[in-house]
């Protein structure tokens, strides 16, 4: 039976994507320590050796999953900015905040994996680039706010890092809070941030 499984073509069309999707579900349900390439292969209906064509080991799969998370989050942040349009830096940052915190609450295990220290050095460059793309999205309304006088001038990158850190910490603290409380508190956090960032 195993021989037939190994010889038949993959019915998914994209085994790599199927493995990542199954891994994300398993991560959310059981955590990273419970992930098994053999079990994921069984769920995908392929031989236990088949995942090795895409991921040399479990860590490579986890790194790919983290990269997928960064790409998805960045895409959602970009969509949030596009939906706001030219409505001011504070409105843009609040839209980013809602999107980031919503993603963090819905994908807590994935977000933990994305920012985990333990990654294969060969994946670190890709993950660093993915994190930089995310920060590029956050820095955009900061630069606009500086141009419009809402935010003090200077290097926008430390400001973007501060905003990102505040949102990440907020999401961690409020993960189990009722949605209406999260929204109320989030608006207050953004208000306080902009008071601190305003020109003196």
Residue locations for each model-derived region?
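N-terminal intrinsically disordered/low-complexity leader segments
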Residues: 1-14
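Generic hydrophobic, amphipathic alpha-helix propensity
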Residues: 15-24, 40, 65-69, 73, ...
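Hydrophobic alpha-helical connector segments
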Residues: 64, 78-110, 159-163
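C-terminal alpha-helix
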Residues: 141, 192-200
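An amphipathic alpha-helix signature
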Residues: 94, 98, 135-139, 143, ...
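Amphipathic, non-transmembrane alpha-helical scaffold segments
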Residues: 16, 62, 66, 70, ...
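Hydrophobic/aromatic-rich alpha-helical bundle segments in the mid-to-C-terminal region
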Residues: 8, 116, 123-128, 132, ...
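Helix-turn-helix
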Residues: 18, 22, 26-60, 64
């Amino acid at each position: 039976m195993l021989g037939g499984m190994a010889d038949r073509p993959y019915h998914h069309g994209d085994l790599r994507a199927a493995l990542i999707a199954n891994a994300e579900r398993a991560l959310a349900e059981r955590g990273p320590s419970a992930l098994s390439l053999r079990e994921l292969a069984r769920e995908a209906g392929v031989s236990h050796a088949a995942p090795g064509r895409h991921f040399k080991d479990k860590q490579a799969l986890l790194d790919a999953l983290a990269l997928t998370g960064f790409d998805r989050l960045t895409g959602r942040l970009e969509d949030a900015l596009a939906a706001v349009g030219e409505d001011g830096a504070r409105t843009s940052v609040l839209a980013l905040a809602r999107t980031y915190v919503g993603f963090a609450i819905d994908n807590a295990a994935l977000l933990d994996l994305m920012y985990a220290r333990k990654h294969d050095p060969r994946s670190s460059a890709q993950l660093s680039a993915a994190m930089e793309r995310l920060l590029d999205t956050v820095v955009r309304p900061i630069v606009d706010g500086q141009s419009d006088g809402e935010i003090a001038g200077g290097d926008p990158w430390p400001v973007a890092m501060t905003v990102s850190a505040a949102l990440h910490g907020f999401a961690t603290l409020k993960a189990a809070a009722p949605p209406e409380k999260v929204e109320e508190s989030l608006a207050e956090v953004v208000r306080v941030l902009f008071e601190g960032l305003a020109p003196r």
